[in-house]
Swiss-Prot record:
Stated family: Belongs to the diaminopimelate epimerase family.
Documented EC number(s): 5.1.1.7
Protein name: Diaminopimelate epimerase
Catalyzed chemical reaction(s): (2S,6S)-2,6-diaminopimelate = meso-2,6-diaminopimelate
Protein's UniProt keywords contain Iron-sulfur: no
């Protein structure tokens, strides 16, 4: 089994090329592979396949709305093995992998996901690095909510970016205060509002066209970055300013991305790095099932 390792602003992934969607990705096996001590280690797994192959293999019962059978399909799994609808950083790395591996020669194409089609543009790309924009779809405001993070209670805006987020802007929070906050420990939220869990972003108020953010991802814990989370953060920060559209730079521990929000869409631009290629031991993989 061949694999690659990559990251988008230090949100890291194992990529498994499986064009016929033949591999058995049980939650147990994925969790073992993503474990940083007994596996390769990653925030998540990206199976590289097509929507038609995933459909034929029973990954889903019907094609996600707007996704064609011949579209590339990013089958994304969280580090705990659970299935996730979308991953903005993952799409950038996925698109970069296709281009670097010679599987895709266009600079603009569509990556399918459970959240629907995600058009991508590769502005620059080589075998190791890339600059990629992902059309993330409309970010939907879903009311307000609260979460307790690091022993502090935060109020935030619920945002659907193909997956659920609670983005909490704190006017009093400084960069130093954000850096010292315990985001790694389990967070508390309203499970009736978010029955399937939620990604929680804590961010500073926007200053000079930028915000700083940390994130606790459902099924993973704190990560160095979260693509859909940066979009949710930008929506919440703009809302905090009384705006519904605009462009913001979002600084995360793993780097910086640029998010543009319009009335009908959102766009995420940032880097991708492919750092390793290798082969999994078949015996080890079989033992994880």
């Amino acid at each position: 089994m061949k694999f690659a390792k990559g990251h988008g602003t230090q949100n890291d992934f194992v990529l498994l090329p499986d064009l016929n969607a033949q591999y058995s990705l049980t939650a147990r096996a994925v969790a073992a592979l993503c474990d940083r001590r007994r596996g390769l280690g990653a925030d998540g797994l990206l199976r590289v396949t097509t929507a038609g192959a995933a459909l034929a293999a029973g990954v889903f019962d019907r094609l996600p709305e707007g996704v064609a059978e011949d579209d590339w399909f990013m089958d994304y799994r969280n580090a705990d093995g659970s299935i996730a609808e979308m991953c903005g950083n993952g799409v950038r790395v996925f698109a970069h992998y296709l281009h670097a591996g010679g599987l895709e020669h266009r600079s603009e194409f569509v990556v399918g996901s459970l959240a629907g089609p995600r058009p991508v543009v590769l502005h620059e790309a080589d075998d190791t690095t890339a600059d990629v924009t992902v059309e993330m779809g409309k970010a939907v405001r879903c009311g307000t909510g609260t979460a307790t993070v690091g022993g502090r209670r935060f109020s935030g805006l619920a945002v659907d970016v193909g997956n659920p987020h609670l983005a909490c802007v704190d006017e009093e929070l400084t960069d130093a205060g954000l850096a010292s906050l315990d985001v790694a420990s389990p967070v508390a939220f309203d499970s009736t509002q978010f029955p399937h869990g939620v990604n929680v972003e804590i961010l500073t108020a926007p200053r000079d066209g930028a915000v700083a953010m940390r994130v606790h991802e459902r099924g993973v814990g704190e990560t160095r970055s979260c693509g859909t989370g940066t979009v949710a953060a930008a929506v919440a920060a703009l809302d905090h300013q009384g705006a519904r559209t605009g462009t913001l730079r979002v600084r995360i521990p793993g780097g910086e991305v640029c998010v543009t929000v319009t009335e009908t869409d959102s766009y995420l631009r940032g880097p991708s790095v492919l750092l390793a290629h290798g082969e999994l031991a078949e015996q080890w993989w079989a033992a994880q099932h």
